[in-house]
Amino acid sequence: MKLSEMRNKVTGLPDGFAGTKKDWKDVAETFRIEKAAILEKDKKDESGEVILYKKGPKQGQPVPDRQIAMQLRTASGEAVLVRTNSPRIVTLYTGDLDRECDEVNRFGDRIYHVEAPEGELKFVPYEMDKKKDGKPLKWDVADLEEVD
């Protein structure tokens, strides 16, 4: 099974999703990210619109929430939105989606969290984000269900 197929199966992305611009338009509608998810809470512009980034693509203008998935993909190279079950963390997958994968290590080491403290995106390797006694925890794809 190709990694792209495994990712679609695990995340619920539609069959045939390949990460093209059209796919992302479709999936951005499906996986709508709450505006508060990637922003400094309650930060608004003069018109009262919530600002998604301190510096958006057009010098700080508000970004419609349906565009966030596509922008995160652009910002991280080949990122694919995996899940958004936290108000401020978005988990992305990056890498070669055509390589073969197995059940034990389906996502390799290419899972990242995107944290947005105060509206600024910051990439953190997933395995470094979960620690116990100061040491990174070993994880597998089941951990994706436990991200909070």
Where are the predicted features?
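OB-fold ssDNA-binding interfaces and closely related basic DNA-contact patches used
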Residues: 1-84
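OB-fold/S1-family single-stranded nucleic acid-binding modules
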Residues: 110, 115-117, 121-148
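Intrinsically disordered, low-complexity segments enriched in proline/serine/threonine
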Residues: 16, 59, 64-66, 89, ...
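Short acidic, glycine/tyrosine-flanked loop/strand segments centered on an H-E-D-like triad
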Residues: 75-100
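Acidic, low-complexity, intrinsically disordered interaction modules
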Residues: 57-65, 92, 101-105, 130-131
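Short nucleic-acid-contacting surface segments enriched for D/E, G, S/T with interspersed K/R
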Residues: 92-121
